[in-house]
Amino acid sequence: MNRQFFLTISLLLLASNTLFAGWVIVQKTYDASEGAQGEIEEILYFQDDKVKMMSEDMATIFDLNSGEMYFINYQTRNYWTGTAQEMEDQVKAAMDEMIEQQLANVPEDKREEMRAMYKQMMAGQTESDAHSRPSDLAVTIEKTTEKSVVAGLPVTKYRVIVDGKLTEEVWLNTDAGIHNEFSVQKFYDFMAGFLKSFQNQETYKDQEAYVQMAKQGYPLKIIDRAGAYETITEVTSVEKKNLSRSDFLPPNDFSEQALTDMQTGFN
């Protein structure tokens, strides 16, 4: 999911049921080796620095202004809401609880030793991640002369070179105005706090050259070679549409739950 986040950005300014022009974007993501048969479809909603990402029965909403986020499960009809810091605190609390559950069957005179060992393992992982931060990565963005059309919109191909290796190819649209609906810098700052709960690690996408490219337009197609598999994300539909504040909130009849009780794919 991290690879798709930089494609999605938005914001809310006015009252609850008032309509504003926003964007609805449909995209598909799949591994190049599997082709279309393994594709996952996602619907993205943008408006005034708010973004909603829907996939099957799940939705994730980010408010870049307030720092609030929602995880919504439409199948179980519940949701979790909070900030990135609150999520990090709850994840840590859940890990501490898991450790205590593991210690329940350990003889009492051995528990403190085992507890210290678990804590050391967790601290060691954090330290390892910190040392692996690629702050010194050489990231170069090459704008090519290659033009194309994706989802009915003109795009220009960019090449992302990381330490001399072609890592991404990005087809960027600069004239539809999608990227004017959000602050790219605000989005990256928000996501840095969000992803901290899952990985204490930067990526080449945090580098200034990459962020500056993202500010120039909206990516309608990406070939990502950074991971073990070549992943392709391609927009299939772009629509400017009136959206309301309620489009970026859980339904009124859904119940709020603790993060650890949510079936979100994050816990």
List each model region and its residues.
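Bacterial N-terminal signal peptides that target proteins for export
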Residues: 1-9
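Prokaryotic Sec-type signal peptides and long signal-anchor helices
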Residues: 9-10, 198
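Sec/Tat signal peptide C-region and signal peptidase I cleavage site
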Residues: 17-21
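Extended soluble regions of mature proteins
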Residues: 22-267
